[in-house]
């Protein structure tokens, strides 16, 4: 028989990809804040909400240009070493603007040591996983999904912006017989109640995954594929 797929964040994006590649095996997709826009745009929107919005306008304007160039570079279909090489000066400029890792730029360090430290930091920041996210455009896979889709976001999600993400799903998933989208007020990317939704709050929140979301998910599965209602 067919299998239903559920995924959170990039897991939701991967669920769409599997559903597109193996339509004969997938009964439905549950996307919990699964990204439906190109990775480069996703990262830039995260940057706007999580980093740039917290900074003075003069700083954020300069950084915005650097981040746009960085993500544009990382989106190019290049070997990872080439991507890291091209990205290093951009990341150094970003870190200098943010005052991060200032030890890398101390005057008493030689240029060769500074360059080596910058390469090390860039190598850590630009992993194969991050590069693959930025280079991936889910639109092709979404347009090939043939199963029912239930896609939800929290209204305070700053990592996968709810309105634009759900609009993309509704627009692209034309092959699906049923697309249900919903935005839950007060919930963050983790589907917990949150003051602002900023990731810096994650470790401080004491609530659990929303019971309302779980109940709605179970009800949708029951109505869509006739499965027994699950009690959470």
Could you say what each language-model-derived stretch is?
Residues 32-143:
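Accessory cap/linker subdomain of secreted extracellular hydrolases
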Residues 147, 161-172:
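Short alpha-helix in the alpha/beta-hydrolase fold that links the catalytic acid
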Residues 156-160, 189:
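Acidic catalytic loop of the alpha/beta-hydrolase fold
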């Amino acid at each position: 028989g067919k299998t239903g797929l559920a995924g959170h964040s990039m897991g939701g994006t991967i669920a769409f990809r599997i559903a597109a590649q193996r339509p004969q095996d997938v009964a439905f997709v549950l996307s919990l804040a699964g990204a439906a826009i190109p990775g480069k745009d996703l990262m830039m929107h995260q940057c706007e909400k999580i980093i740039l919005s917290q900074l003075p306008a003069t700083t954020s304007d300069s950084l915005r240009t650097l981040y746009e160039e960085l993500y544009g570079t990382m989106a190019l279909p290049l070997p990872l070493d080439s991507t890291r090489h091209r990205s290093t000066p951009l990341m150094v400029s970003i870190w200098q603007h943010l005052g991060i890792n200032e030890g890398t730029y101390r005057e008493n360090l030689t240029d060769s040591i500074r360059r080596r430290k910058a390469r090390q930091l860039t190598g850590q920041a630009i992993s194969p996983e991050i590069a693959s996210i930025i280079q991936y455009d889910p639109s092709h896979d979404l347009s090939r999904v043939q199963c029912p889709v239930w896609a939800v976001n929290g209204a305070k999600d700053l990592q996968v912006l709810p309105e634009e993400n759900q609009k993309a799903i509704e627009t692209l998933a034309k092959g699906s017989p049923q697309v249900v989208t919903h935005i839950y007020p007060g919930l963050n990317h983790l589907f917990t109640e949150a003051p602002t939704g900023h990731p810096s709050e994650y470790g401080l929140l004491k609530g659990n995954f929303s019971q309302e979301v779980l109940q709605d998910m179970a009800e949708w599965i029951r109505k869509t594929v006739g499965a027994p209602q699950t009690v959470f």
